[in-house]
Amino acid sequence: MAIIYNPNKKIFTLHTAHTTYQMQVDPLGYLLHLYYGEKTNSSMDYVLTYADRGFSGNPYAAGMDRTYSLDALPQEYPSLGTGDYRNIALNIKNEKGVESADLLFKSYEIRNGKYRLQGLPAVWADEKEAQTLEIVLADENAQVEVHLLYGVLEENDVITRSVRIKNTGTGQITIEKAAAACLDFVQGEFDVLRFYGKHAMERNLERTPLGHGTIAFGSRRGTSSHQYNPAVILAEKGTTETAGSCYGMLFVYSGNFSCEAEKDQFNQTRLLLGLNEELFSYPLASGETFTVPEVILSYSAEGLSALSQQYHNCIRNHVCRSKYVHMQRPVLINSWEAAYFDFTGDTIVDLAKEAASLGIDMVVMDDGWFGKRNDDNSSLGDWQVNETKLGGSLAELITRVHEQGMKFGIWIEPEMINEDSDLYRAHPDWAIRIQGKKPVRSRNQLLLDFSRKEVRDCVFDQICVVLDQGKIDYVKWDMNRSMADVYAGNLSYDYVLGVYDFMERLCSRYPDLLLEGCSGGGGRFDAGMLYYSPQIWCSDNTDAINRTRIQYGTSFFYPVSAMGAHVSAVPNHQTGRVTSFHTRGVTAMAGTFGYELNPALLSDEEKQQIREQIKTYKKYETLINEGTYWRLSDPFTDEIAAWMSVSEEQDHALVSVVRLMAEANQATVYVRLRGLKPDAVYLEEQSGRQYSGAALMHAGIPLPPFTEEYEAYQFAFTELKEAGRLYEKVQKWCDGNAENRVVISIYGGSGSGKTTLATALQQYFLNDGTECYLLSGDDYPHRIPKRNDEERMRVYKEAGEDGLRGYLGTKKEIDFDRINEVLAAFHEGKDSITLRHMGREDGEISLEETDFSGISVLLLEWTHGGSDDLHGVDLPVFLESSPGETRERRIRRNRDENAASPFICRVVELEQEKLEVQRKNAGLIVGKDGSVYEQ
C-alpha cells in the first residue's frame, strides 16, 4: 500500500516507487514532519531532538518541559500564534481581530483514488493509480478545522498536497494566509532554484545558496506572472543534472502565489508554497469551507533531470485532460506576426492557401477580427464578428479556409474590456476598479470582474455564438495585463476560480477544441492552465537564441508538449536578431511547433525548408512530445544549447544543438548524451555512423566545425535492435564452440543492411572485450565494380539471362580462392594476413598486411557469404529481404549508377533467387521484422 498508518507510534508513511514521506502525531497532538526523501521502511521519528532553546517558547500542554518547542521542531502545517516564529503556513483571524490557530490532531482517513478539489484544477488519477490521506487538525478555541489532503501517485513518484479550511464556529473568521504545503528539514545545506523573468523573457533559472533568513518570491499580479513561476526546487549543494538530491514544489494555480524558503537559527530549513498573503484576506462565514489550491511534490536522488522527468510525466498523464495531450497536433501558422491588425478575410484565405502548399495544417486568425478592432484601443468585450473587415460571415471564412485543406483557429481574450466598447458603455461597473478611484490601465484595457457570474455568463454566451458559427478547431486564449485595483481581499482568488469556471464550461461544451493558453506569451504558464489547455504559448519572444533559454528554464517543470513554439521571420520582431531558418526550426521543434510569419514574403529556398522542417517534425513528433527529456547544457553559461529526447524503450533519440557563442579558431565541442542503453549500439541516421550507448554518454559526439553564427544541428539515433538480438544468439553459439577463432558471415541482398548489421555486431563484440575484425567481401571480385557491371552487361548480351545467371556470384565473377585463403589463414592462427582492398575505379586495388594477433572473431560482410564456393565460415547469418526492398535501399544508398534501371533491377532479382537457394546454408536468419531465429 502507498499509505500506511502505524497506530502504536502514530506515524503516517507515504510511499511512492522511490520515495518515502513520513509524519507523526506526537503526545501533545501536534503533527510533526519526520522525513521526505529516498525510500525507506524505517520509522524516522529518531530524527526528532529536544533541547532547551533560549527564547523558543513551550506550549502550555508541555508543562514544565522546556525542551519542547514548536519553534525548533519540524511541523507539517505550522500556524501563527503557537510560539513558532518562523514563516508559517496558516494565519486565521477571528471576529475580534485575534490571529491564532493552535492546530491539534483530530482524525484521519485513508481511501483509494485521488481527492478532488471543487472548482480548482488538480492532479487526477483513477482508484488504482492513487491513494488519498486526509488528516483533520482542529482548534476548538479558534473554531476552525484544517483538512490536510495528500494524494499519493505511487508509480509517478509524486505526492500532492492541498488544504481545506472550515469554519466550525458561529461567527466569521478570516483567512489571512494559507499555504498549500510546508516542508521542514532538520538538516541540510540547500540551494534554492527559482525561475524569474519579465515579459518576453520568462523563466530564467536562478540558483541561490540558502543562507540564514528567508528567500521569498511570488506574484501579486492576479496571475502566476512572467516575473516568477509558481515553482521551486530545493537542491542539496553540488546537485547536478544527473546526481544529487533535490525537491520540487509546483503550484497548480494561476493566480497570486508566494514561495518562502527559510534557514532558521538552528540551521533547519522550511519551504512553503501557497497563496500570497498580500492583497489576500478571505472571510469565511459559519460552516463555510475554503480550499487552498494544490501543490505537487516530487523528490529525486538522481539530480535535476530525473526530477524534471517526474514532473513531465505527471503533467502529461495526470494534469492535462485534453484529448490532444497524447495526439499529434496540427502544425499551425498564426496571423499575428504575419499581419498584426491589418488583415481581411482574403488575407486569411491567402495565408491558408500559401501555408497549405507548404504542408502546414492550420491557420489561426489572431487579434483584430471582432468589433471595431483595428488597433489595441477598442472593442475588447464586444465579441461580435466584424463582417465588413472579413468580407463576409465567419462561417463563410471558415468554409473558405477548410476548402484549402486547412484547419481553422481563432484568438480570444475573454477576461478583458476596452472603455471604447459597447459592453463597457452598458456595464462600466463590470470592470475591476476601486470605488471612487480611476482604474489602472494596461495596454489600453481594463480587467473584467470574472469573480462575478453574470459577467462570465455574458462573455461566455458571446464566445459560444462565435464558436458555433462553424467548425473551429483551435482557440488561443490570451490575457494581456496584470490585475490592479484589488477592491477586496477575496477578489484575486475568486477571480481565478471564475476563470477556471469559464474554461471548464468551454472545454465541456467543445470537447474537440484544441485550446492554447497565453498571457502575453508565458505570463500564465502554470499547471493550473495546463489542466484545461494542453499547451501554452511559451513566450511572445520568438527569437531562436532567447528561446533556447526560455525553453530551458520552462523544462525544469513543464514538458515539451506544453510549450508553444514557432518559427518566426527575421530580423526577429522582438530582438532584431538574424538566425538561419534551420536554427529557428530546430529551436521551435523543442515545443509544439508552428510558424509566426508571412510565407508570401519567403524565398523558394525558405519555403522548401518549411516543407522539410514539417516533414522532420512529424517524423519525430511523438519522440519529442512523449519522450524522456534531457538537458545537455546550460544555455546561460555554455557556448551551446543542447537537449535531447529519448523514447521510453530507449531505442530512439533526437539530439538538438544550437551554437550560442562564436570565436575564432574554436575548439571542438563535444556533447555527451544521456538516457541511452550503455550496451546497445546506435546508428546516427544522417552520417550512418554507429556508436555504443556508453560511448555516446561518456565520450559524447564531436560537433562539426561551426561555419556560421548561431548554427544548429540535429542528430537522430536508432538502436540497432537486430544486432542486439543477433549478438545474443551468436554469443550462445560461440560459448558452445571450441574453436579459438571463429568466422561469421553476414549475407543477403545488395543494400539489405549487411554493413550496418555487421558493424553493429562488431561493436557488441568489442563492448564485451572480444577483439573482432570486419572484412568486406566486396574487395574480392575479379574486376572492380565499374568493370564488373560492364562484364555483366556483356555476358547478358552474349548469353542472355541464363548466361547472366551462370555468371552472377560464381567463380567467374568472384575470386573465391583468394578469400578462402584469408579464412584458412585466420583459422590457422596466423597473426599477419594479407588482405586485398578494392575501390570503384581503375587502379584502386591494393594489398595490405593486417595484424590479426589477439583477434578471435572474423566478421565477413558479403552478399555471397552463404555461397557453396565459400569455405571456412563457421556461422553463416542470412538477412531476409525482397528484391523490391533491396532495390529501394540501393536507390536510397545512392552508391551505384542506374540503380533503378531495368537491367540492374533484373540483376537484383536473379541475385535474390540465388540467395534463396543459399538460405539453406544459414545457421541463423534475421527476419524482415528484426527477429533472429535458427535455421
UniProtKB/Swiss-Prot annotation:
Biological processes, Gene Ontology terms: melibiose catabolic process; protein homotetramerization; raffinose catabolic process; stachyose metabolic process
Q: Which UniProt keywords apply?
A: ATP-binding, Glycosidase, Hydrolase, Kinase, Magnesium, Metal-binding, Multifunctional enzyme, Nucleotide-binding, Nucleotidyltransferase, Transferase
Which Pfam families does its entry note?
Glyco_hydro_36C (PF16874), Glyco_hydro_36N (PF16875), Melibiase (PF02065), PRK (PF00485)
- What SUPFAM superfamilies does UniProt report for this protein, alphabetically? (Trans)glycosidases, P-loop containing nucleoside triphosphate hydrolases
Q: Active site located where?
A: 526, 606
Q: Where is this region: Sucrose kinase?
A: 721-935
Report the InterPro entries cross-referenced here.
Aldolase_TIM, Alpga-gal_N_sf, Alpha-glycosidase_related, Glyco_hydro_27/36_CS, Glyco_hydro_36, Glyco_hydro_36_C, Glyco_hydro_36_N, Glyco_hydro_b
- Activity versus temperature? Optimum temperature is 50 degrees Celsius.
Which residues does the annotation say bind Mg(2+)?
Answer: 176, 277, 280
Name this polypeptide is given: Bifunctional alpha-galactosidase/sucrose kinase AgaSK
